[in-house]
Curated annotation (Swiss-Prot):
Residues 317-332 have a biased composition (Low complexity). GO terms for biological process: intracellular signal transduction. The modification Phosphothreonine is found at residue 13. This is SH3 domain-binding protein 5-like. Residues 1-57, 275-332, 364-392 are annotated as: Disordered. Transmembrane segments: none annotated. Keywords: Coiled coil, Guanine-nucleotide releasing factor, Phosphoprotein. It comes from Mus musculus (Mouse). PANTHER family: SH3 DOMAIN-BINDING PROTEIN 5, SH3 DOMAIN-BINDING PROTEIN 5-LIKE. Functions as a guanine nucleotide exchange factor (GEF) for RAB11A. GO terms for molecular function: guanyl-nucleotide exchange factor activity. InterPro entries: SH3BP5. It comes from the Eukaryota.
């Protein structure tokens, strides 16, 4: 009993012999069961084709990032803008409330002293305009002096050689003279403007001095009100400048957002245009036509040319008629026309002329014997075929 093994069910099986029940239990498993969860079919569906992978433009991701950044910046800056506007309105309301309270306590002295503080404001503005006019006048004087120096250099170059006149120095002299005239006009204009604003500033200062002497008592009593008003005015100007800056940032962010959207639209149009330009199906390799043969019609498939292409089309058309009694008259006429066209192409071929023997018969019997072996399959389908004779 050394050649027997003890089976799991108590049976003894000779060595080297398989148990039938084990083979039955371990039957062949289907390939679908080996793939967990049917991942084989899903992977082919979710995987992008090479054509789709080629159409993915990297500029899309870049423009989407710009779009997201601009959107986040717009949201953040708009929140800051709303907060700044709320703060500005709150300060404006508080300043108006405090000023009204202060004005009710002081009484009529505020209205009496108001011309004095208005004159001070105008005098301050006139003083600032005077400073700006002085800067413009100084700039015009500097330009005039530089232009005069250029004219002097050009005159020295022209007078260096008295025997001949250099056109380069002459052109430089003319240009320098024009600059001197323009600088002189600008200097005179700046001088007149400076004199005008200086007179206005002097008049404003004189008015301030006169009102200060006349309204000395009302000015002293209303000083707290106007000082508080000046403080609130400065605070409001700062918040107004902040609001204006935030509005400009929002406008710039919205401009970048619009540019990113426009770029995405252009990329999308380019992709659609490229898709419309591609063929719907990739064309396979085409076989070349025989030497001397013309290209077949568009209706014939790639690779079907000459006699084989025409006869192949005839066989397929004849086989599609089904197991009926036979093709009708129109079908036979079409097949005959295709056969004649293929024979004409064959006879026009240079290779065919080289293959013909010198003793070929004029009635085409030898040609018919050669082509009978290739056309034997469709003799039953197409009853009578025309024999075309070849004349050399």
């Amino acid at each position: 009993m050394a050649d027997l093994k003890k089976a799991a069910g108590g049976r003894e099986t000779p060595q080297g012999e398989l148990r039938s029940e084990v083979v039955e239990d371990e039957g062949p498993r289907s390939p679908v069961a080996e793939e967990p969860g049917g991942s084989g079919s899903n992977s082919s569906e979710t995987k992008l084709s090479p054509r789709e992978e080629e159409e993915l433009d990297p500029r899309i991701q870049e423009e989407l990032e710009h779009l997201n950044q601009a959107s986040e910046e717009i949201n953040q800056v708009e929140l800051q803008l709303d907060e700044a506007r709320t703060t500005y309105r709150r300060i404006l309301q508080e300043s108006a409330r405090k000023l009204n309270t202060q004005g009710s306590h002081l009484g009529s002295c505020i209205e009496k002293a108001r011309p004095y503080y208005e004159a001070r404001r105008l005098a301050k503005e006139a003083q600032q305009e005077t400073q700006k006019a002085a800067l413009r006048y100084e700039r015009a004087v500097s330009m005039h002096n530089a232009a005069r120096e250029m004219v002097f250099v050009a005159e020295q170059g022209v007078m260096a050689d008295k025997n001949r006149l250099d056109p380069t120095w002459q052109e430089m002299l003319n240009h320098a003279t024009c600059k001197v005239n323009e600088a002189e006009e600008e200097r005179l204009r700046g001088e007149r403007e400076h004199q005008r604003v200086t007179r206005l500033c002097q008049q404003a200062e004189a008015r301030v001095q006169a009102l200060q002497k006349t309204l000395r008592r009302a000015i002293g009593k209303s000083r707290p009100y106007f000082e508080l008003k000046a403080q609130f005015s400065q605070i409001l100007e700062e918040h107004k400048a902040k609001v204006t800056e935030l509005e400009q940032q929002v406008a710039q962010a919205k401009t970048r957002y619009s540019v990113a959207l426009r770029n995405l639209e252009q990329i999308s149009e380019q992709i659609h245009a490229r898709r419309r330009g591609l063929p719907p199906h990739p064309l396979g390799p085409r076989r070349s036509s025989p030497v001397g043969a013309e290209a077949g019609p568009e209706g014939i498939e790639d690779g079907d040319s000459g006699i084989e292409g025409a006869e192949g089309g005839g066989l397929e058309e004849g086989s599609s008629l089904g197991p009926g009694p036979g093709p009708d008259t129109d079908t036979l006429s079409l097949l005959s026309l295709r056969t004649v066209a293929s024979d004409l192409q064959k006879c026009d071929s240079v290779e065919h002329l080289r293959g013909l023997s010198d003793h070929a018969s004029l009635d085409g019997q030898e040609l018919g014997a050669q082509s009978r072996g290739r056309r034997g399959s469709d003799i039953g389908v197409r009853g009578g075929r025309h024999q075309r004779s070849v004349s050399l």
